[in-house]
């Protein structure tokens, strides 16, 4: 059985879906005001890998990942370049889809955009007001945190902890709130900003309400898994829980999953620190599969340190797997030995999607394959495991002149003309083709 580390309970729990053999997942997507950086891509790759493993295990996955296209950062960025917020969002949504396609990310079941859910957001906020969980103040609408049952339980904080942190705050928005901890569900329009009509006057939604509405509209009041980066645990996911459960009276998500950060020199990669590298720029010099492999093969909850050496190691390891995949097939091999590798891989991945242990099994299997165990059944199993990591190798073919040289070398070896055989081998090596003579015949790989 798959076990998931649930942030809410701080424990490893058996995964039991609401509907048998179906997984409903909502993963917070990007705020589309710029290209995503490697840290953002970590979340995208981690949850794509988790989704792929569920599918490997036979589940149908409804995978929802949103685009936040209404936000302060988008408004600011659009104003700076003199275009509409929609034009800016459209540009970076397209860039996101193109960049993540190179990382082998499967298309989501749906990628909802906030701009398409405005009526539903207004209706959601209205219900919270009617139930006494929210109030209007000078055109803004705020959520009453003190009315929420066990607020901040996800972040393992108490109201007292938060109140200490909020003490002493003073600004115009705080003055409009009943309590400094209250958060905005709806923001009154400011001059020159995009806005929508509402019962409380023109304005736009707050960030937290957007995800609650899109998740529940598409997947229902309770979902199996809600995921995102560890930085979203508080306040974003905390506030999603508060407002969603206030509206429905039901548990919002049964499992909460959070991926670790990408660090540079052991410091979190972020735009605010200026130590980030965009995926868009990285893909100009690094193959998308290499970057994917670097991100996918670390246990998703642990931080990753981003270094040139780590990328180089991923490239070398991926090349070994590619060469293994291209080996010629052998005679039928031991199914018991194959099953042992499959069982070990499943045991690793069932343990909270431990890709670090899973990839160790993958390389053990590759070593076994290279020792002459590679029939159709093994190749199919090997490819399916690679696909969990988002890796698909195209079948490689050789040019006719290369094939002819290999045949000439085989003939020379048969005639014990080893000088000619060695000359052809060296000629092929100069072209990046490495030959390996085995009892099953000659194998080749590309350097």
Swiss-Prot record:
GO CC annotation terms, alphabetical: cytosol
Chain positions of motif 'KMSKS' region: 268-272
Broad class of the protein's primary localization: cytoplasm
InterPro entries associated with the record: Cys-tRNA-ligase, Cys-tRNA-synt_Ia_DALR, Cys-tRNA/MSH_ligase, CysS_C, Rossmann-like_a/b/a_fold, tRNA-synt_1_cat_dom, tRNAsynth_Ia_anticodon-bd
Binding residue positions for ATP: 271
Annotated EC: 6.1.1.16
Motif ('HIGH' region): 30-40
Gene Ontology biological process terms from the UniProt entry: cysteinyl-tRNA aminoacylation
Xref: PANTHER family: CYSTEINE--TRNA LIGASE, CYTOPLASMIC, CYSTEINYL-TRNA SYNTHETASE
Name recorded for this polypeptide: Cysteine--tRNA ligase
Species of provenance: Streptococcus thermophilus (strain ATCC BAA-250 / LMG 18311)
């Amino acid at each position: 059985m798959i076990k998931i580390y649930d942030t809410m309970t701080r424990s490893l729990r058996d995964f039991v879906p609401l509907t048998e053999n179906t997984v409903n997942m909502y993963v917070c997507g990007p705020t589309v005001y710029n290209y995503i950086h490697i840290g953002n891509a970590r979340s995208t790759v981690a949850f794509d890998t988790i989704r792929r493993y569920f599918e490997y295990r036979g589940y149908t996955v409804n995978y929802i990942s949103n685009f936040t296209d209404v936000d302060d950062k988008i408004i600011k960025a659009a104003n700076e370049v003199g275009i509409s917020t929609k034009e800016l969002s459209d540009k970076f949504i397209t860039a996101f889809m193109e960049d993540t396609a190179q990382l082998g990310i499967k298309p989501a079941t749906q990628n909802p955009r906030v701009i398409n859910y405005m009526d539903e957001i207004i209706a959601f906020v209205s219900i919270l007001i009617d139930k006494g969980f929210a109030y209007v103040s000078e055109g803004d609408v705020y959520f009453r945190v003190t009315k929420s049952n066990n607020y901040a339980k996800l972040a393992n904080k108490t109201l007292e902890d938060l109140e200490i942190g909020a003490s002493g705050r003073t600004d115009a928005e705080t003055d409009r709130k009943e309590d400094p901890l209250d958060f905005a569900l709806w923001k009154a329009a400011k001059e020159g900003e995009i806005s929508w009509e509402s019962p409380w006057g023109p304005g736009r939604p707050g960030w937290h309400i957007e995800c609650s509405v899109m998740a529940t509209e598409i997947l229902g009041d309770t979902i199996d898994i809600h995921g995102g980066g560890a930085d979203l645990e508080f306040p974003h996911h905390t506030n999603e829980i508060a407002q969603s459960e206030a509206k429905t009276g039901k548990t919002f998500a049964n499992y909460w999953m959070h991926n670790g950060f990408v660090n540079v020199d052991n410091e979190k990669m972020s735009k605010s620190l200026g130590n980030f590298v965009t995926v868009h720029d990285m893909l100009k010099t690094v193959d998308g599969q290499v970057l994917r492999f670097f991100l996918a093969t670390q246990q998703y909850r642990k931080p990753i340190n981003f270094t040139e050496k780590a990328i180089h190691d991923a490239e070398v390891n991926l090349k070994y797997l590619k060469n293994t995949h291209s080996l010629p097939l052998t005679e039928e091999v031991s199914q018991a030995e194959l099953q042992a590798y499959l069982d070990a891989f499943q045991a690793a991945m069932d343990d909270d999607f431990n890709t670090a242990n899973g990839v160790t099994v993958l390389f053990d299997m590759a070593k076994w394959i290279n020792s002459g165990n590679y029939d159709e059944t093994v190749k199919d199993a090997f490819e399916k495991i690679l696909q969990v990591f988002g890796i698909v190798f195209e079948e490689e073919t050789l040019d006719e002149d290369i094939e002819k040289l290999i045949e000439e070398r085989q003939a020379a070896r048969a005639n014990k003309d080893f000088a000619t055989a060695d000359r052809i081998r060296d000629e092929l090596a100069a072209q990046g083709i490495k030959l390996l003579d085995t009892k099953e015949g000659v194998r080749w790989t590309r350097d």
